[in-house]
């Protein structure tokens, strides 16, 4: 029997846990992330996000109206000092089916990337190939990653600032060859809530030391900027995420998304914001109620 929370859990902790389960279930329902018969490879780094994702999926597995299989996976990249025993011991104690994959990507990254440069890009590409191969070997058709709402917003700004693109992390993505769907069940979950939950669960966290000082990374700078905005005006990060879910192509400038050249004068368009007020009463994307069975049944089961 899987132990979902500590024996001495407070009411506030249980409320937080239920909130995270609800947000995870809602994201899964909104994007149809999980279907009957799925085998899901749950990627575990040993950080707070992947631990939380696994626990949310295990909780939902017990009450979901569909049957799906979970296989936890950790990639041991042979970093010096990496505590290789921690995740296997935890997953065995939890009673979760798992696979530990050993691959010395650390040496490759150190050989290819000059000292002091960011290793994330190459490391990510190497990890991705190994994850896809492992999913194929295990017969998984879905790959679950632990990215949360704040990761998605940070990625939007990273791509705008450094790539001149309005591009974030989709909650669900088909791989290039169409073999797998990559899903992000924590897409609706705030990082601060995940951090609080992880502290309450006392997960055996494994820090990421491969990249060196995280403060020097572009992502950390964007994270600091967003945290400053959030302190100045609470709720701003969530509003940005809601905007990602509520795009109006006719009010942007991408000719691939909207046919500006052949736009008919007789066609009714939304009011130009230059001449009208900002729509403060627009329906937030996260309040949309799906008629899909997963979320309807999920809500019924936790009531």
Swiss-Prot record:
Chief site of localization: cytoplasm
Highest taxon, organism lineage: Bacteria
Compartment(s) of residence: Cytoplasm
Catalysis performed (reactions): cytidine(32) in tRNA + S-sulfanyl-L-cysteinyl-[cysteine desulfurase] + AH2 + ATP = 2-thiocytidine(32) in tRNA + L-cysteinyl-[cysteine desulfurase] + A + AMP + diphosphate + H(+)
Pfam families per record: ATP_bind_3 (PF01171)
Enzyme Commission numbers on file: 2.8.1.-
NCBIfam families tied to this protein: PRK10696.1
Protein task: Catalyzes the ATP-dependent 2-thiolation of cytidine in position 32 of tRNA, to form 2-thiocytidine (s(2)C32). The sulfur atoms are provided by the cysteine/cysteine desulfurase (IscS) system.
PANTHER family for the chain: AMINOTRAN_5 DOMAIN-CONTAINING PROTEIN, SULFURTRANSFERASE-RELATED
More about this protein: The thiolation reaction likely consists of two steps: a first activation step by ATP to form an adenylated intermediate of the target base of tRNA, and a second nucleophilic substitution step of the sulfur (S) atom supplied by the hydrosulfide attached to the Fe-S cluster.
Name this polypeptide is given: tRNA-cytidine(32) 2-sulfurtransferase
């Amino acid at each position: 029997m899987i132990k979902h929370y500590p024996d001495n859990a407070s009411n506030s902790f249980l409320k937080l846990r239920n909130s995270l389960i609800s947000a995870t279930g809602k994201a899964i329902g909104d994007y149809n992330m999980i279907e009957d018969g799925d085998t899901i490879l749950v990627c575990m780094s040993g950080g707070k996000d992947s631990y939380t994702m696994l626990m949310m999926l295990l909780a939902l597995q017990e009450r979901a109206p569909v049957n799906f299989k979970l296989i936890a996976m950790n990639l041991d990249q042979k970093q010096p000092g990496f505590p290789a025993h921690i995740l296997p011991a935890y997953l065995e104690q939890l009673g979760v089916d798992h696979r530990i994959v050993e691959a010395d990507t650390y040496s490759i990254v150190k050989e290819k990337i000059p000292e002091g440069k960011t290793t994330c890009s190459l490391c990510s590409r190497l990890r991705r190939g190994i994850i896809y191969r492992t999913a194929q070997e295990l017969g998984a058709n879905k790959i679950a990653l632990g990215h949360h709402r704040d990761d998605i917003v940070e990625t939007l700004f990273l791509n705008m600032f450094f790539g001149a693109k309005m591009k974030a992390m989709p909650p669900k993505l088909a791989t290039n060859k169409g073999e797998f769907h990559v899903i992000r069940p924590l897409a609706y979950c705030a990082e601060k809530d995940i951090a609080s939950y992880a502290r309450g669960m006392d997960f055996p966290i494994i820090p990421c030391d491969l990249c060196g000082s995280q403060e020097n990374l572009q992502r950390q700078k964007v994270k600091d900027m967003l945290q400053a905005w959030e302190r100045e005006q609470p709720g701003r990060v969530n509003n940005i995420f809601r905007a990602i879910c509520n795009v109006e192509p006719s009010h942007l400038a991408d000719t691939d998304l909207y046919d500006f050249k052949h736009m008919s004068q007789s066609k009714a368009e939304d009011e130009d914001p230059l001449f009208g007020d900002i729509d403060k009463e627009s329906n937030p994307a996260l309040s949309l109620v799906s008629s899909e069975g997963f979320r309807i049944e999920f809500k019924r089961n936790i009531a």
